[in-house]
């Protein structure tokens, strides 16, 4: 991971934080309380989740509050997230946005002051041990996806043609060989082409060779399946 790469990732993260701030400032209290596609979560809850995550990662203290409704929670991480979210449900959307602005200001100052080895050294991440720069890519993706969850609930399109949108699509595209080869069980020698249209345009060709699905530059055979996806709400 080069210096330029992690700096670009940070820039993507900062841009998404700024987009969330601008978006949140435009919302009414009713809009903040609107349910989203995330089970049990409102627009406000999505932002509360991002606050809780950044507080935890920054060593800024976890809540002692315990949520009582855990019906939609599937695992220990989800339970931890729910405690953070539920702790802020009695607050106004404006108050939650203010906390988000404060915590992201602190996090940005920390990252901007960190030495290069902080980003290149390995640490534990949701995908195992990896450089901190990789973890930050996951954070940028998570923030952008939840921004889109919030926007979709209110039918307010925005921040789709952005660096974080491209980063998110590219990270999701890395998982497509697993989807094609294992989950869809595409047969040996077959080729699948996926074309993602605007605003983030990508064309991914995947061929199964020796039982393994791999991304290729040029399909080795006529595609067995071709599909086009509009990228607008792809992150949701």
Task: Give the ranges of each region predicted by the language model.
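C-terminal interaction segments
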Residues: 218-236
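Helix-loop segments that flank and shape redox-cofactor active sites
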Residues: 21-42, 110-130
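A glycine-rich beta-turn/hairpin centered on an aromatic-Pro dipeptide
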Residues: 165-208
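Short, helix-capping/interhelical loops that line the mouth of catalytic, cofactor-
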Residues: 1-8, 56-113, 117-119
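Short, contiguous alpha-helical
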Residues: 33-75, 125-180
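Non-cleavable N-terminal signal-anchor transmembrane helices
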Residues: 1-34
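Contiguous mid-protein beta-loop-alpha structural module that forms a pocket-lining wall or clamp
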Residues: 85-155, 159
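Alpha-helical initiation/capping and key positions within long helical/coiled-coil segments
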Residues: 8, 12, 45, 49, ...
């Amino acid at each position: 991971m080069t210096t330029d790469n992690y700096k670009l990732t940070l820039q993507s993260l900062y841009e998404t934080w700024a987009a969330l701030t601008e978006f949140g400032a435009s919302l009414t209290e009713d809009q903040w309380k609107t349910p989203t596609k995330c089970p049990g979560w409102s627009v406000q809850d999505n932002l509360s989740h991002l606050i809780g995550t950044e507080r935890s990662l920054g060593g800024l203290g976890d809540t002692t509050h315990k949520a009582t409704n855990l019906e939609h929670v599937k695992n220990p991480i989800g339970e931890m997230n729910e405690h953070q979210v539920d702790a802020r449900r009695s607050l106004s959307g404006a108050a939650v946005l203010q906390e988000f602005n404060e915590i992201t200001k602190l996090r940005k100052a920390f990252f901007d002051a960190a030495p290069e080895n902080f980003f290149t050294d390995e640490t534990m991440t949701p995908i195992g041990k990896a450089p901190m720069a990789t973890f930050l890519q996951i954070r940028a993706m998570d923030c952008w996806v939840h921004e889109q969850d919030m926007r979709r609930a209110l039918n307010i399109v925005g921040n789709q043609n952005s660096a974080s949108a491209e980063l998110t699509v590219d990270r999701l595209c890395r998982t497509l060989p697993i989807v094609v080869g294992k989950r869809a069980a595409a047969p040996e020698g077959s080729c699948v082409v996926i074309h993602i249209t605007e605003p983030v345009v990508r064309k991914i060709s995947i061929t199964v060779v020796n039982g393994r699905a791999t991304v290729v530059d040029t399909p080795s055979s006529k595609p067995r399946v071709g599909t086009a996806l509009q990228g607008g709400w792809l992150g949701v």
